[in-house]
């Protein structure tokens, strides 16, 4: 007969034992690497096209200068990684679906940049409309991720809110580009 959790004096949040500092640091590093790998892969399709077709594209009047995108995305990717790590640390019952939602949004994030920047020269405006569909799906996926993260770690959920705000803003830029190019 197995003793009950209460009899073992284990934390009620699902953790059997806390992770060691070394394991926590390694997993945080892994989340950061994954996040910045997505950023780096997206950057490959951006580099040539920001100074190519996008330089002469009709951009939204509220579009920020190109130099601002790098620092904003760097902060957002770091926040995403820390949020995922905070959820992972909890070992809560819904950690697996929460991190699955995180992986889905990261995949959609990875898809958007090459579609928007990389496919435009080949597909024209159709690439921009496809990118808009991806970013709308991305906003939905991040919203689902926040809904999973929040109950596990309030801080993790809050860390993703600026990401959603930026994605909504970016979707308006994408929409403008699709309509006007």
Range-by-range predicted roles:
Residues 34-51:
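Alpha-helical transmembrane segments of multi-pass membrane proteins
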């Amino acid at each position: 007969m197995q003793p009950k959790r209460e009899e073992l004096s284990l934390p009620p949040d699902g953790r059997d034992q806390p992770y060691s500092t070394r394991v926590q640091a390694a997993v945080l590093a892994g989340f950061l690497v994954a996040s910045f790998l997505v950023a780096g892969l997206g950057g490959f399709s951006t580099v040539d096209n920001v100074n190519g077709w996008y330089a002469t594209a009709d951009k939204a009047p509220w579009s920020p200068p190109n130099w601002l995108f790098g620092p904003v995305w760097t902060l957002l990717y770091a926040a995403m990684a820390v949020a995922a790590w905070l959820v992972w640390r909890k070992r809560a019952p819904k950690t697996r679906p929460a991190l699955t939602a995180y992986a889905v949004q990261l995949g959609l994030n990875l898809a958007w940049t090459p579609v928007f920047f990389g496919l435009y020269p080949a597909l024209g405006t159709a690439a921009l409309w496809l990118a808009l569909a991806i970013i709308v799906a991305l906003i939905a996926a991040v919203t689902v991720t926040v809904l999973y993260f929040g109950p596990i770690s309030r801080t993790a959920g809050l860390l993703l809110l600026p990401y959603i705000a930026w994605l909504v803003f970016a979707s308006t830029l994408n929409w403008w580009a699709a309509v006007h190019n």
